[in-house]
Structure formats: structure tokens, C-alpha cells
Amino acid sequence: MDGRNRRKGLEWHFDLAMSMRGVGWNWQVKNIPQVTPKTKWQFVRTQLSKAFLFYFLFDFIWYNIQGSIYATPSPPPLLSDTVPRQILWTWIPGLESYYSFNMQFPLFSALMVGLGFYEPEDWPPIMGRLRDVDCVRDFWGKFWHQGLRKVCVPLLKLH
């Protein structure tokens, strides 16, 4: 095997090992959204804009959490607050995680496409639309695109 084929084989192996959703492979998970084709630099600009937006939203929520009474060493019980505030403070940590995760993916995808390692179509959105979610199954199948299934299921089958 010459050096070029060996390098191609290593690239192929790395791509396969890192693909949690199988994008572009014969085992791609269902419900990954189809995206309209973009040029390399349109994609990079769009992804960097998304990363900035999600960073701003993450930062906004993080500072609100840090300044809240619930970030103190002895926070009051959540049920002692009004119902609207209970709902708000139940959603805020989830939104913080959502924004944190969605800030990293577009940044990394812009870097990989910008450097020429991948094409824009190799990076469909990491999450779907929340309006497509009606139940827990839809959350994992349509919103999250079964992102952890291929990684976790083999571990669960260990005896």
C-alpha cells in the first residue's frame, strides 16, 4: 500500500469513527433534515452567524442563572416560587445546555469546511425543529436525529 492510499484509508477510518449519525454512509440514521446546497463560504458564514447567536443566547442565560437566587449556596425550594417562575426556572437549564451544544457544532463545522476537510453537505444541522416534536420518541428521532443511538446501543448489548 503506497502512502497516498494509506492516508486515504486513515481519513476514511477517522471519518467513519467520528460520524455519530452516519451522515453520507450506508447506515445514516433517519430524519436528518435535507439542506439546500450552499457554497463553501456561504456555509461558513451561516455557521459562524449561528455560533455567534447561540453564544449570545447562552451567555445571556448563563448570566441570568448566576445572578439568580437559585445560584446561591442555599437556594429556596423551587415550589416556593410562583408557577410562571417555576416553569421558567425549569426550562432555563435545558435552554442553557441546548445553546451550549448548538454553539459548538456550527463553530466546528465552519472550521472543518473552511479548512477544506469536509464539504457543507457533510454537516447537516445537529438538531431538527422543535415544532416537529409531539412526544418523547419524536424528540429523539426527529429533533435529536438519533445522535446517540449508534454510540450507546452497542454498549448496552454488552453481557
Task: Give residue spans per PLM region.
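Membrane-interfacial catalytic/cofactor-binding modules of polytopic membrane enzymes
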Residues: 101, 109, 113-159
